[in-house]
């Protein structure tokens, strides 16, 4: 039969949207993936539901270039993972506890099976996107202006973020171990590029992509390679010390339990950048099938780039997320007003909070709030310091929180004491 072709102008925003959108921004595959499936006679809906069979068929077609195959496969596996995430099987019903034990056990089994399937899809998406970026005829530097490479970087970053989160849902909110096992794949977690975390327990790894903080004027990010994360450390052992709520007349000469003032708080929420790469792979087949992968955590304050596949690439980072989460979980504004009328026992003595791990090579800026106030008064300034690359490189912020219903001279002495103890 004959096919009639006509031409018409379309809006610029439609053109750009078609070029740049993907399964991450709409319930449809990207135009690049749809084109590959169309020219091979595959249905997008069927391939999204059965990615393994579809990818296996695509591999048998020699006309499909390596970049086309790897990028389409990565998006298909990610599409299936996102579909599973939205399904009822991968969610815990709020009515589950009211059902019989037999039904609860069956639902739990289905829930875990769904998460296992989702983890398998994310594992495949990570591998195919990595192979596209670092093991094709063209390297990343040859595709620097390609929209497709930006899409694949996003697939890679999101797949890592969702893999870590889904693994925590599947195996419970226990402390993060040294590996993540997905079927036959083993992702070993490496903290060599985050010296502070060596030999330290990590309570939680949290992706920051979906975090939004209404009280922050802006979110400070650094564009680059890798998935933006936030690391949560366990509470300090001295958090339950009876000296936290005890008024101490002369803190400079007081003998604290364990020799440390319990009101000095090291940073618990740390910015991190996560990458995933094969431990050893020289071919695309090894990248896709070798079970050994490595998740590397980077300290974005100390590392601006990472060596991936033998070359150095700038690292992404989110510097505002740890500060935003700290503010949200401490509810300091409410405590400030209660302290004014002497109703908050936590503020018998001043507290000092380090917003990042102490770095002796950076100058310390100590911010002290005023009457009936809290460290929330310094949100804009603190976020600006973290957002400016030069200030971030040379300064670190400490926040002091104290009860404002005490005499000014007494408050001044107590604050001076806790600052001195922090440096010691």
Regions found by a protein language model. Give the residues of each.
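Active-site catalytic motif of lipid deacylating hydrolases and related acyltransferases
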Residues: 362-424
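Flexible, membrane-associating and regulatory peripheral segments of lipid-active enzymes
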Residues: 3-365, 374-380, 396-399
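Sec-dependent N-terminal signal peptides of Gram-negative exported proteins
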Residues: 1-2, 385
